[in-house]
Structures are given as C-alpha cells and as structure tokens.
Amino acid sequence: MVMHAPMLLTTTKINLTTYKLAPMEKIDNWMSPMSEEKLLQACARIKHVALDMDGTIYMGSTLFPYTHHFLDTLTQLGITYSFLTNNPTKSHKDYLIKLERLGIHATDEQMYTSSLATIDYIRLHYPQAKRLFTLGTPSMQQEFIKAGFELTTDDPNDRPDILVVAFDTTLTYNRLCRATWWASKLDIPYIATNPDWVCPTDQDVILVDCGSLCKAIEGACKRTPDIVIGKPNPNMLYCIRDMRGLDSNEIAMCGDRIYTDVATAQNAGSLGVLVLSGETTLETALASNPQPDITALNVDEFGKLLVKAHS
C-alpha cells in the first residue's frame, strides 16, 4: 500500500522542468495541466463519475475513510456514479456484496466488471460462440455460465470456440499449460479480460494479474491476446455513456492507475482523474506523458474540486 502525507501535493517541492512538462496548475490538493478556468469548466460538465475500486475507494478489504463523504458529495451535486473494475475474480454480485459489507449500497446497474464487458464483447463480435476455455476463478466462471456459455474442460479433445484469460487466483499449472496450448492454435480467438500486471493489495504479497499471465503464455507460444477488454479499452465507458444518454465529456473516470484508468478516459474522450491513494506515486504522475487531466491526493479531494466547479 502506498502511503502519502496529508498535504503531499501542496508541500512537496518539485521542479516540473525536470520532467520536461508544461507548468501545472496547482489548486489545494489537485494538479492539472489545464488552467484553473478550463479545469473548472471541464468539471462543471460532469454528470457521471466512473470509479475504479481497488486503490481508489478501498484497498484490499479496507474502505478508505473519505469514500463515504465523496459519494455523498456526488449525490448532493446530482452526479451519478458507477463502479468499474478490471478485477474479474468476483462476479458483479460478489462485488455488490463486498461493497455492502463495507457500507456502500450499490445496484446492478452501478457495477461493471471486465468479465461483464468481455461477455458483452463476445456476444457482439462472436455471436455464434458458445464454448469457452477460461483461466478464471469459479466466481468469474459462473458469470459466463449464467450468460449462457459452456466451459470446456482441461482436455485436448474438448476444443473451445474462444480462449478467455483472466486474473485467476485459483490458477493451476495444468490449466495454464492448457490455455497456452489453445493460444497456440491461431484459429481460436484469444481474449484477455484486463491488462493489469498486478492487483493492488494491503497484504505483504504480489498478486500476479491477468497481464502477467498473458506474458507467460506469450513467452511459451509467442502469441498475444487478440484483444484486451478491460481498461484502458474505452468500451466500458462507452457502455455507460450510451446507457445513460450522456456525452463522453460529461463522464469522469477516476482511478489510481495511469495506464488503465486515466488511459481509458483519454481513449473515450472523457475526463481522466488520477488519485494517489493506490499504485501511482506523485513522481510517476509527474513523469507521465500525456498527463492526467486531474491528479488528486484522493477521491475526496476530487470531490472538493467538483463542489467548486458546480457552485
């Protein structure tokens, strides 16, 4: 877990020219490459906030102390919100239960996982596909079964229509080898649920995520996924945009990773908000190119900016 001093953005003295960036507007605990006027105009347009979860509103099983206040702020401003996660290890129902346990009530419509996005992608692009070989947890596999798919076994004669590789905390060596076998068959579409190398955790361990599993498969059979569904692919935000009848610039994507959360927003034409409560450090944020539209200490500091913009 990355720890930050309470006033990191305002008290840390950094020579931005070291990073060859244009000077950034500094407002309390926020930073932006935009002027304050343009920043507030962009925030004033926001009608919906898509929230990453791990590293953004909680870490592992611990809710950040400011999360409730931030969500209350959105409600008071009339801004709707949803939860997006690249972590496919749990079904969307499991995530709703976890949020409820943490004191956050959310509906089915507010939860969108990379598993659900993968299901939507397969239905759209491979409507005849029914049989899948998946690297994924039992909870994720149930999500696909409920959607009408059949999961193939670890048998070379049980040929799938599509290979789906996900973050799998129940991974066995045999199934990794079988997934690699199917990936070596170029006529079988190969889909990855998300690009993350590791999953954030508050435990003393590194959780190897989907991107790392795909790299292992690539090392063995020289094939990469045909498509990676989760963030930074903009499809998840496009679905939210279309379902809610919004324009892309009326949505903010808020998360702790530049290469997934912020990149998703930029790819979708939405406002990209980086929070420093998870994976990304201030130094990494300053060195990134392009810059996040907003870099905030945490979601509550972003909420204060929204209040200012909507007042």
Residue spans for each PLM region:
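Asp-based, Mg2+/Mn2+-dependent phosphohydrolase catalytic module
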Residues: 4, 8-53, 59-79, 88-112, ...
